[in-house]
Amino acid sequence: MLTKPNLPALGRLLFTSGVSSRMEIDNQFASDISNLIRLYVDGDWGDLSADDWEANIIACHNKAGGRLMGAYKTYDQTRIWIITDGYSRQDLGPDYCYTTVLFPEEY
């Protein structure tokens, strides 16, 4: 059984323009985003199917790395995705990994 990891290195943290704009005008939303990032880093990927959750765990334990995803809702039920591309891909160098906070419609 693979255990839920703590994710120490998620690369560069990016926000889409939509999320960034909303954070600038809505303090509660910005606070929620900070809290959701903490959940994500702690290996709590929110509202994912069991298959997607397991895929995240496998990617964390796979030496080839992979992609991680979390799906959440903010205080007003706005859906947020957090996606890490290139997690643990040491063969591509440390600058390859990045984590993006976005609205699903921005994907």
Identify what each model region corresponds to:
Residues 1-69:
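Compact soluble domain cores
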Residues 59-107:
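Short, compact, well-ordered microdomains
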